[in-house]
């Protein structure tokens, strides 16, 4: 770059409103679910999500790349599923708002190309073609001015004809107009901007797109409508033809993108069902909501214009229940763990049928003991009914991944379980220039759930199944989880260390802050209750999300209040700047503009501050030794006042 030249400035940033609900529509989400979405999103990404929800017309692939947000730590356990559900909610909300933009565009275009303005536009087109004398007929262009099916090919053919007319008249775009071309896609990423020749035409088109996107209910304008009859030129007629043709094509392209986005939202929900099925196996109490969601998706695929509200309601309702289940959602890892265990069981079973022990590639033990120990059978010495063995590799036996629900007979009985026969584990290979796959059917998910539940209740799987069948009849009580908290240390509470005590004492003696914690008295033995990193919440939600405190820790505490809880680290606001797509970088620019700090005021200047005395009495490099310092004259003038 040559010295003294400046880099070209980016396109101007739009101004889009973001309400308190981050532009989530009330006709798609209830107040409870909108509040849930706001609680899950961090404050730093809230404005950016509001811009995405506004519905700026965009290609589906660009919108997929732009959607970005952060989930609060309070929802860390459900984060893998919450991220996908929030993304679907943003896409559906964007679709509805963008559909309203298209409806306004169609209405405004019909109003613009109507009498008496229609007659004046056609007269200008006729004068334009006659003056050019290129053989271009006015009918070849006017037939598309009122059409709703101006495809990209039709648009290119019409623009070629207009370019012939433009070249014949010797019209060219001015450098000032070309410098303003980026404004044409600020409020609409689907618009194909034509080569307007004047600054006035570029600004007028940008204002029209801005009014339509922001739904200001202002009529579309063209140069023919705002200029008097005596002041209209052939160049104005040419720019009006550019405007009408590209807006007609924008109308069709926007409609096609909305159809693709509508189908893509349903497809994302359909793909999410694979993960939601394993989430259902982790929290069986979500059975009814999950079944309702799948049935709704089946109906949505059968309609050309499905309603998103029932589907979004079931998704957020399922997410709420999964969050209340308080388990780590890991559908992909759970899928793979089930495959590893079932494949090992199958290999051992096949070896026993052949009269062999272990796998073919494994050596036998020295004492000849079968290799069934490779299944990692683990004994449970705390069980009451003798010695029990369970699969230690069964992830359903982990209480943080799968937890036996209350009244398990309502959800874990065989006839209440939702079967999925085609649960596949797929591996990809490359053979002879082709991609091949190996599939394994996972058909024992229910057995793994029962084995994991029996381990948590300290029963054999057979006894656990008997209780499930007899409990609804009142013959037996519901199986309950066996707690072993007294065998392990309680890591959810820890005493205040000396360093923390000294720092807390020093902070209490100084100016008190809202997050300061007062020390208990020396006669009291109370401890400071803290939360682990996985349960950090904001100060506004710490009382609602709850703490994972064990019963033993609660019995040993004395008057623990919310002020004694450890506060989470303050999270800095984070705005995502996407410079390639200007409509969505306004949040970052707006954020920086409000956080910019003013420079400190200059040092005081007065009689005591000259080049011979004062805090900066050292000779300055900007003045020569023989040049008078302007501060000397200022000091003399102040002395004579």
UniProtKB/Swiss-Prot annotation:
GO cellular component, one term: viral tegument
Biased composition (Low complexity): 500-563
Biased composition (Basic and acidic residues): 632-641
Designated name of the protein: Tegument protein UL35
Keyword Nucleotidyltransferase: no
Pfam families cross-referenced by the UniProt entry: Herpes_pp85
Biased composition (Acidic residues): 358-367
Keywords (A to Z) from UniProt: Host cytoplasm, Host nucleus, Host-virus interaction, Inhibition of host innate immune response by virus, Inhibition of host TBK1 by virus, Inhibition of host TLR pathway by virus, Viral immunoevasion, Virion, Virion tegument
Gene Ontology BP, a term: DNA-templated viral transcription
Region (Disordered): 353-373, 500-572, 587-641
Record-stated family: Belongs to the herpesviridae pp85 family.
Keyword Mitochondrion attached: no
Basic residues bias locations: 589-599
Cysteine-cysteine disulfides: none
Source organism superkingdom: Viruses
């Amino acid at each position: 770059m040559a010295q003294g030249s400046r880099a070209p400035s980016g396109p101007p940033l739009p101004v889009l409103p973001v309400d308190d609900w981050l532009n989530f529509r009330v006709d798609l989400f209830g107040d409870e679910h909108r509040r849930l979405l706001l609680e899950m999103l961090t404050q730093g990404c809230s404005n950016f999500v509001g811009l995405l929800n506004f519905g700026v017309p965009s290609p589906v692939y660009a919108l997929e790349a732009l959607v970005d947000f952060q989930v609060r730590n309070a929802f860390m356990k459900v984060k893998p599923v919450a991220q996908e559900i929030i993304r679907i909610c943003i896409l559906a909300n964007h679709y509805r708002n963008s559909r309203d933009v298209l409806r306004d565009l169609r209405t405004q275009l019909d109003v613009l190309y109507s009498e008496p303005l229609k007659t004046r536009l056609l007269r200008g087109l006729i004068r334009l073609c006659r003056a050019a004398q290129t053989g271009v007929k006015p009918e070849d262009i006017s037939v598309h001015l009122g059409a709703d099916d101006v495809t990209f090919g039709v648009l290119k053919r019409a623009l070629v004809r207009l370019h012939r007319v433009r070249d014949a008249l010797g019209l060219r775009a001015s450098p000032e107009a070309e410098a303003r071309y980026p404004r044409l896609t600020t409020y609409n990423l689907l618009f194909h901007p034509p080569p307007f020749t004047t600054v006035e035409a570029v600004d007028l088109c940008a204002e029209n797109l801005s009014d339509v996107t922001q739904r200001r209910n202002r009529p579309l304008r063209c140069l023919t409508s705002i200029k008097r009859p005596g002041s209209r030129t052939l160049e104005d007629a040419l720019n009006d033809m550019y405007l009408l043709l590209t807006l007609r094509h924008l109308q069709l392209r926007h409609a096609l993108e909305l159809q693709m986005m509508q189908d893509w939202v349903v497809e994302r929900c359909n793909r999410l069902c694979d993960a939601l099925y394993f989430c259902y196996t982790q929290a069986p109490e979500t059975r009814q909501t999950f079944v309702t969601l799948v049935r709704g998706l089946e109906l949505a695929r059968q309609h050309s214009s499905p309603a998103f509200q029932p589907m979004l309601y079931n998704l957020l309702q399922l997410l709420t229940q999964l969050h209340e289940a308080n388990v780590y959602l890991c559908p992909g890892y759970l899928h793979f763990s089930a495959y590893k265990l079932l494949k090992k069981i199958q290999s051992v079973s096949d070896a026993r049928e052949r009269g062999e022990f272990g796998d073919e590639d494994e050596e036998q033990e020295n004492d000849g003991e079968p290799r069934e120990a490779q299944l990692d059978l683990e004994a449970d010495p705390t069980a009451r009914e003798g010695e029990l063995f369970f699969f230690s590799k069964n992830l359903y036996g982990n209480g943080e991944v799968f937890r036996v629900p209350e009244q398990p007979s309502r959800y874990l009985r065989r006839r209440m379980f939702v079967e999925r026969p085609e649960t596949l584990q797929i591996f990809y290979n490359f053979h002879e220039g082709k991609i091949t796959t190996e599939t394994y059917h996972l058909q024992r998910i229910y057995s793994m759930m029962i084995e994991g539940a029996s381990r948590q209740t300290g029963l054999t799987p057979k006894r656990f199944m008997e209780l499930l069948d007899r409990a609804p009849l009142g013959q037996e009580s519901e199986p309950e989880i066996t707690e072993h908290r007294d065998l392990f240390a309680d890591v959810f509470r820890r005493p205040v260390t000396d360093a923390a005590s000294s720092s807390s004492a020093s902070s209490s003696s100084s100016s008190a802050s809202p997050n300061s914690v007062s020390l208990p008295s020396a006669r009291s033995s109370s401890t400071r209750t803290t939360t682990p990193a996985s349960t950090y919440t904001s100060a506004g939600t710490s009382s609602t999300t709850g703490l994972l405190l064990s019963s033993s820790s609660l019995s040993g505490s004395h008057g623990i209040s919310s002020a004694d809880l450890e506060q989470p680290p303050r999270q800095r606001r984070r705005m995502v700047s996407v410079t390639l797509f200007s409509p969505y970088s306004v949040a970052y620019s707006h954020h920086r503009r409000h956080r910019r700090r003013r420079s400190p005021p200059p040092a005081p200047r007065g009689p005591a501050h000259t080049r011979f005395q004062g805090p900066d009495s050292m000779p300055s490099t900007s003045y020569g030794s023989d040049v008078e310092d302007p501060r000397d004259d200022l000091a003399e003038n102040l002395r004579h006042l």
